[in-house]
Amino acid sequence: MTTNRLQVSLPGLDLKNPIIPASGCFGFGQEYAKYYDLDLLGSIMIKATTLEPRFGNPTPRVAETPAGMLNAIGLQNPGLEVVLAEKLPWLEREYPNLPIIANVAGFSKQEYAAVSHGISKATNVKAIELNISCPNVDHCNHGLLIGQDPDLAYDVVKAAVEASEVPVYVKLTPSVTDIVTVAKAAEDAGASGLTMINTLVGMRFDLKTRKPILANGTGGMSGPAVFPVALKLIRQVAQTTDLPIIGMGGVDSAEAALEMYLAGASAIGVGTANFTNPYACPDIIENLPKVMDKYGISSLEELRQEVKESLR
């Protein structure tokens, strides 16, 4: 009964539970496999993959903030070829039944399409998360500009959707005046779902050096501090589209996960909490049925339908 009440079905994804480690906070799964059986998870969003290898931004790239953290990693990754030859085969060999969501990033419409096409051919990749909202990449902050401009977003999403062999979920940035317009552009371009929110943009200063702590200057802010912002934006988008939303942004407990459902999410991404507690995801999964019992929630699917009806 516990298994059934946590099950989630989304385009391309039939999940035993809704808890998914967020991209950038879980590597390619190998680090956390030392702590627990990854088959406990609903899915994994692997680290962002670009066409060519990226070394990322100069250090320091991480800074602590009250109730959260800043990061300016800069999409460090080994590139598509290595991900296809090493990272995804390892996951398929060790966890053949675990559906993978591949995070795809790029610097042009053509690159997004090429990476989406290549990575979607991996048999364990069941969906793509299209990163059009990373705030830390050079090239005129191109990723952020795509996520802010509905026309650019439409073009990139359409190219990725046409190139991919699996459903495409679009990751939305909160750094926009009207997030609904970008969400609708993604929907019109053929996206199967949305993930939100990506990090806010922030910075910290070192009082001794009088300079920013991060070498990049600014970084993406995540953690519990952004949770209320995520809830508000998810609710705003859920009121205007029927696309399923994988909600993320500060989730660190079963209670927070259920709040995401009340906002309009259909599954849950867990990010920064993995750094403070490597068992964050299995802990949330274990606690979900207890918290659901406490608040009279029989199943997540029933809750999702109840919220969906209330938003109409």
Swiss-Prot record:
The keyword Flavoprotein is assigned to this record: yes
Top EC category: oxidoreductase
SUPFAM superfamilies (alphabetical): FMN-linked oxidoreductases
Protein name: Dihydroorotate dehydrogenase B (NAD(+)), catalytic subunit
Family from the record: Belongs to the dihydroorotate dehydrogenase family. Type 1 subfamily.
Organism, scientific name: Streptococcus pneumoniae serotype 4 (strain ATCC BAA-334 / TIGR4)
Gene: pyrDB
Organism lineage string: Bacteria, Bacillati, Bacillota, Bacilli, Lactobacillales
NCBIfam families associated with the record: PRK07259.1, pyrD_sub1_fam
EC number of the protein: 1.3.1.14
GO cellular component: cytoplasm
Co-factor note (free text): Binds 1 FMN per subunit.
